[in-house]
Amino acid sequence: MPRISQPKIDKIKEQILHHLFVSSPQSLFTSQIASEIARDEEFTKTLLLNLKEKSLVAEVNKNPQGREYLKRQRWRLSNSAFEIYNKHQN
């Protein structure tokens, strides 16, 4: 499998952030994000964890009833990233 260059990885991360902004305030599962950006789930999860380290996305570990997910993860844009995106949209 060919290695993906860093500029292309950055573009994919931008696509993820944009998709989370558009779907905000709804949080999305990793599989939903992966299908939207046409990448496999493991690669998408790696990028999401990288974005989490940079405080650009937040991981949602509980369902609407308050139970923790055992194997799934949902993601949303962090509050600070949402404010920055929203400011640039206007």
Explain the meaning of each model-derived region.
Residues 1-17:
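Short alpha-helical segments that sit at the start of domains
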Residues 52-64:
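A short, conserved structural fragment
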Residues 61-73:
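Short, Lys/Arg-rich nucleic-acid/phosphate-binding segment
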Residues 9-10, 26-27, 41:
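Alpha-helix N-cap/helix-initiation sites
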Residues 21-25:
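Short helix-capping/hinge SLiMs at alpha-helix to coil transitions
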Residues 76-90:
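Short, amphipathic alpha-helical interaction segments positioned at domain boundaries
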